Amino acid sequence: MARELFRTPIWRLDKFIEDQLLPDTTFLTELRADIDSISAFLMERCFQGAAHPVRVSRVVMGGCYNEYTVLKGRSEANMVVFLINLTSFEDQFNGQVVFIEEIWRHLLQLQQEKLCKLKFEVQSPKEPNSRFLSFKLSCPERQHELEFDVQPAYDALYEVRHFKPFDSSNYNKVYAQLTHECTTLEKEGEFSICFTDLHQSFLRYRAPKLWNLIRLVKHWYQLCKEKLRGPLPPQYALELLTVYVWEYGIHENPGLHTAQCFRTVLELVTKYKRLRIYWTWCYDFQHEISDYLQGQIKKARPLILDPADPTRNVAGSDLQAWDLLAKEAQIWIDSTFFTNHDMSIVEAWEVMPERQECVFL
């Protein structure tokens, strides 16, 4: 697959995405149906008859599962099981082992009842009292597989998620609680799944061309994982870099060339030591968390703040992982891959790796 991308003429990148990266529509239809069945099953069965008041309020897909940017082939995603009658992020952390065990028990029952159209396999926890649980939905005939990490979560947005129109001030109280608990518990960035709805909204109303560009970057990232065999920065960091490049390009270059976008993302990867990117969308410097946010953007780089969780630096702290990916990005930049049919070179846009003022576009 790496050769297929590398050998693709740069002016045919859009065609490559369409032919090689877009998922099979039949698989997507069956996947949505199975996810609905699993979600309904968990909402109906989990914690029924339990002495405590915790119940499943809803189930939301997150992580790399996104109907706008999901890839053909093998992918990973999150299934977030939101719980009501928790009162804090700390409640989520303290009860996670119990919640995981309950959900695992019912997923095994669902597997036995064979209600899914796709092949459904629950993975056994790797150790007793595990905080991790996963299952797979696959279609071997179409060579599609999606592995889900199941994560129970405090439904922090339960009371505000339906407010229309979108107004970031609705989240002031939630973010004040989040930053206080995260700093007290020393768990910054560990509750980002509670904001899965906002992660989805961040991409939902974007242009389809951006979704396809994210698919291309995700595909390149997977090729790097296969080749380099070492730890790499989180994939979501690359997705956010892609959004950042897009937001710049939509102003400067209304025509938006896929190859230029892609090259610019790779150029930013090579400048990882200077990255400081954040969005003032769900939170900003007018909120109660202004002082906290000021401290966040002064921290060591690379810094890519989660647009829905100001406590989470999506870039992580592994500089060796970034260095490994940056070297691979430079190999692609220096290669003939970005050569046009007239032998000219596709140039990157001059996008600053540090953003002075960020807004949601």
Curated annotation (Swiss-Prot):
**GO MF terms on file?**
double-stranded RNA binding; enzyme inhibitor activity
Knockout consequences: Newborn mice are viable. Female mice display reduced fertility due to deficiencies in ovarian follicle development, reduced efficiency of ovulation, and the arrest of fertilized eggs at one-cell stage.
Could you tell me the keywords of this UniProt record?
A: Cytoplasm, RNA-binding
RNA-binding: is it a keyword of this entry? Answer: yes
Gene Ontology CC terms, in alphabetical order: cytoplasm
Tissues/organs with expression:
Expressed specifically in oocytes (at protein level). Expressed at highest level in ovary with lesser amounts in intestine, brain, thymus lung, kidney, liver and uterus.
Source superkingdom:
Eukaryota
Any Pfam family the entry gives: OAS1_C
Which biological processes are named by the entry's GO terms?
A: ovarian follicle development; ovulation from ovarian follicle
InterPro entries with a match to the protein in the record: 2-5-oligoAdlate_synth_1_dom2/C, NT_sf
What's the chief localization of this chain?
A: cytoplasm
Annotated localization:
Cytoplasm
Q: What induces it?
A: Unlike other OAS1 proteins, not induced by polyinosinic:polycytidylic acid (poly I:C).
Query: What is known about what this protein does?
Result: Does not have 2'-5'-oligoadenylate synthetase activity, but can bind double-stranded RNA. May play a role in the control of female fertility, possibly by binding to and inhibiting OAS1A.
Q: Which family does it belong to?
A: Belongs to the 2-5A synthase family.
What does the annotation say about its assembly with partners?
Interacts with OAS1A, the interaction inhibits OAS1A catalytic activity.
Query: What name has this protein been given in UniProt?
Result: Inactive 2'-5'-oligoadenylate synthase 1D
Q: Which organism is it from?
A: Mus musculus (Mouse)
